């Protein structure tokens, strides 16, 4: 383990459109097939909700080490549909629903 402070080791920022497949691969590693977000749904999330999709990029190798993503909504209860329908994101929504927290092992 490096003695570097976490902010020295990783860059934290919003995901870029061209990183959707890398995020989908991390999702595949972190979750069983029946729970992992598909490539299509991951691309939809990145395209429609990039403002709530944060990544950690390892500065030593330039690769994504993990990510956190969600969507905003006025709903107060997490719905299964949020995981498969990025169009349910309401940028003005008062609540943020966490859809995934993925970190490579």
What spans do the regions from the language model cover?
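Short acidic N-proximal helix/loop "leader" segments that mark the beginning
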Residues: 1-5
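Helix-loop element at the rim of GNAT/NAT acetyltransferase active sites that forms part
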Residues: 14, 24-38
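A short beta-loop-alpha structural element at the N-terminal edge
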Residues: 9-22
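Cytosolic beta-strand hydrophobic patch enriched in CBS
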Residues: 53-58
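Short loop/turn motifs at secondary-structure junctions and domain boundaries
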Residues: 44-49
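Short loop/turn microsegments at loop-to-beta-strand junctions
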Residues: 11, 51-52
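Conserved acyl-donor/pantetheine-binding loop and adjacent beta-alpha core of acyl/acetyltransferases
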Residues: 63, 67-101
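Active-site acidic-Proline motif in GNAT/NAT acetyltransferases
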Residues: 104-105
């Amino acid at each position: 383990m490096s003695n570097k402070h976490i902010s020295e080791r990783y860059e934290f920022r919003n995901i870029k459109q061209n990183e959707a497949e890398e995020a989908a691969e991390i999702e595949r590693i972190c979750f069983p097939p029946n729970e992992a977000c598909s490539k299509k749904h991951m691309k939809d999330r990145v395209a429609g909700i990039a403002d709530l999709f944060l990544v950690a990029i390892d500065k030593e190798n330039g690769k994504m080490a993990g990510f956190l993503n969600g969507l905003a909504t006025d709903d107060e209860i997490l719905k299964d549909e949020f995981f498969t329908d990025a169009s349910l994101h309401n940028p003005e929504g008062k609540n943020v629903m966490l859809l995934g927290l993925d970190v490579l092992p």
